[in-house]
Amino acid sequence: MAEKGLSKRTYLIYGMGVSYFILDQIYNQWLSFYYLPPSNEVTLKPLLTPTLLIFAFIFGRMIDAALDPIVGYLSDKSKSKYGRRSFFMMIGGLPLALTLILFFFPLKSSIMATFLWVALINGLFFTAYTLVSGPYNALIPDLANTKEDRINLSTVQSTFRLAFTAIAMILPGYFIAKMGNGNTEKGIRLTVILFTVLGIAGVYICAFFLKERELTQSREKLETLKLKDSLKYAFEKETIIYFAAFFLFFSGFNILRGVVNYYVVSVMELSVKSNTIISALLFGAAAIAFPITGKLAKKYSYKKILIADIAILIVGTIGLLFVTKDNRILAYPLFILCGLGLSGSAFIFPL
């Protein structure tokens, strides 16, 4: 007897859960800008040196790396009535929202106090981030009854992730200018609160309304890997190669996301509000190309299309190196080109 596929409701609610990427985008795009604003940003003052900010970031990432297998193991063993993955999302959601907001209300009594604040909040942020993101992504194999379900869940996640990332990249520049009314710090704080509430709402919609326990009841009796066995798989050759490629690509992707604000303000010499236009071009191109990329990938293989998309992205980013205030009009088609590359490389590669 053929396995019954998942309902449209399940796909929709699962897709809502990746709204934590709104918080991820705010973190990557606006945190550095807030603590290390460009010199022509008159209402913000540098709060940390680049070196101290990097050390604070590294501390958070170390926490993330250390907790990931532990959270995976604990969620595998969970017997919560809400579902073993949803339970951890519920635990991590509110701390994730609170810590993101606290980044933008730092201690300012001294540079060391600010550094310790950022390092501490960063560690707590990534603890909460791991509690949400790890179990959420683990839902795909738990929920899928068939190979088609698995592909569809991955596609839904990628589509929603693209949409949520676009929302968090395109709209904040406008809201910061509008809500700040000339005060960038005030605008950033109010915008962060607004988008954090929006982002975390989707996480709780997914956690409470997915009905994970009901959908995975027949699977929870399956034997799960021991922690030491999970760690052993993590050091296999194929896993290391995949992780290295994943790490290198997303390091570059996060750099691109993180420098957009600086690029618009310092290189193109435009206002923060202009970031809305640039981000709309970048993610608009990615959104338009995304379904086309998917069809081409099925026809010619994901590997070939992924290589082509990365090549397009490389050409676009190299071109951006030669943009100045005098020829800044060239940045617009180059960001569109980057968006075309991102349509596959950033949103198909994780599948």
Task: Please place each PLM-identified region on the residue numbering.
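Membrane-embedded alpha-helical bundles of multi-pass transporters/translocases
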Residues: 1-351
